[in-house]
């Protein structure tokens, strides 16, 4: 059986939550959580915004462009922070690389 697919996040990466993980709003606690088998992670508001943009189609560069435009912040600073955050989530098994669609 294959283990988790570890990724190295870069500007060209197209990250997505793996099938076993879901980003959901917990209405009882009024917080966003990432639910995975036997694991729960409560990301902060910024992480939630980044994760909502990570749909497997957008690259990390695209996500950074959107956030830099929205917050009128330097793109390179946003990109550095986004890569670091996503790499941390990937290292913990909460993120994977989107697979190419085959037809």
From Swiss-Prot:
Listed Gene3D superfamilies: Coenzyme PQQ synthesis protein D (PqqD)
Keywords from the UniProt entry: PQQ biosynthesis
The organism's place on the tree of life at top rank: Bacteria
InterPro entries: PQQD, PqqD_bac, PqqD_sf
Pathway assignment: Cofactor biosynthesis; pyrroloquinoline quinone biosynthesis
Segments crossing the lipid bilayer: none
GO-annotated molecular function: quinone binding
GO biological process: pyrroloquinoline quinone biosynthetic process
Pfam families: PqqD
Stated role: Functions as a PqqA binding protein and presents PqqA to PqqE, in the pyrroloquinoline quinone (PQQ) biosynthetic pathway.
Family per similarity comment: Belongs to the PqqD family.
HAMAP family: PQQ_syn_PqqD (MF_00655)
Complex formation: Monomer. Interacts with PqqE.
UniProt-recorded name of the protein: PqqA binding protein
UniProt source species: Bradyrhizobium diazoefficiens (strain JCM 10833 / BCRC 13528 / IAM 13628 / NBRC 14792 / USDA 110)
Gene behind the chain: pqqD
């Amino acid at each position: 059986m294959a283990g988790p697919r570890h990724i190295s996040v870069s500007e060209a990466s197209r990250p997505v939550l793996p099938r076993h993980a879901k980003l959901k709003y917990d209405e009882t606690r009024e917080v966003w959580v990432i639910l995975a088998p036997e694991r729960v992670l409560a990301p902060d508001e910024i992480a939630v915004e980044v994760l909502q943009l990570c749909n497997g189609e957008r690259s990390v560069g695209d996500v950074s462009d959107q956030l830099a435009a929205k917050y009128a912040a330097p793109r390179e600073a946003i990109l550095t922070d986004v890569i670091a955050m996503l790499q941390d989530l990937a290292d913990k098994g909460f993120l994977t690389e989107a697979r190419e669609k085959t037809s």
